[in-house]
Amino acid sequence: MLTLKIFVYTVVTFFVSLFVFGFLSNDPGRNPGKRED
C-alpha cells in the first residue's frame, strides 16, 4: 500500500510540474501566430 501511495504522489507531482511548466512557457509573445482558448 505504501508503494502505491508513493507511486500516486510521484505521478501527481509529475503532472503538476508538467502543467506549471507548460503554463509558464505559454507566453503570448513567444507564439504570436498561435492562439489558445
UniProtKB/Swiss-Prot annotation:
| UniProt-listed SUPFAM superfamilies | Photosystem II reaction center protein I, PsbI
**Subcellular localization, as worded in the UniProt entry:** Plastid, Chloroplast thylakoid membrane
One annotated Gene Ontology cellular component of this protein:
photosystem II reaction center
The processes (GO biological process) annotated in the record are: photosynthesis
Q: What is known about what this protein does?
A: One of the components of the core complex of photosystem II (PSII), required for its stability and/or assembly. PSII is a light-driven water:plastoquinone oxidoreductase that uses light energy to abstract electrons from H(2)O, generating O(2) and a proton gradient subsequently used for ATP formation. It consists of a core antenna complex that captures photons, and an electron transfer chain that converts photonic excitation into a charge separation.
- Subunit organization: PSII is composed of 1 copy each of membrane proteins PsbA, PsbB, PsbC, PsbD, PsbE, PsbF, PsbH, PsbI, PsbJ, PsbK, PsbL, PsbM, PsbT, PsbX, PsbY, PsbZ, Psb30/Ycf12, at least 3 peripheral proteins of the oxygen-evolving complex and a large number of cofactors. It forms dimeric complexes.
User: Entry's PANTHER family?
Assistant: PHOTOSYSTEM II REACTION CENTER PROTEIN I
Q: Which family does it belong to?
A: Belongs to the PsbI family.
Q: What is this protein called?
A: Photosystem II reaction center protein I
Which species does the entry assign this protein to?
A: Oedogonium cardiacum (Filamentous green alga)
